[in-house]
Amino acid sequence: MAVKFHLCLLLIILVGMGAHVAFADQQFCDHPYGTCYYVEDECPEDMPVDCSENFYCTEPTNKCCCYE
């Protein structure tokens, strides 16, 4: 029973570390760079650039819209 618990705990830690490493090369999409919007919506006129390649949002259904 203890072995299963330790394996489960190890799996949770490894998945968490993998999620962190996935965004290590990107900055969080936030002020002053941009704002996160739903992927199906267009970026607003004052933030027309879709900069999801450089910035990430916490929700996978969002994209980052940045200023020019």
Swiss-Prot record:
The keyword Signal applies. One of its GO terms (cellular component) is extracellular region. Keywords: Disulfide bond, Nematocyst, Neurotoxin, Secreted, Signal, Toxin. Contains 4 disulfide bonds. Its main location: secreted. Coiled coil: none annotated. Induces neurotoxic symptoms on zebrafish. Has also been claimed to be implied in calcification, but tests on homolog proteins suggest that proteins of this family have a neurotoxic function and not a calcification function. Belongs to the Cnidaria small cysteine-rich protein (SCRiP) family. gamma subfamily. This is Small cysteine-rich protein 2. It comes from Orbicella faveolata (Mountainous star coral). The lineage of its organism: Eukaryota, Metazoa, Cnidaria, Anthozoa, Hexacorallia.
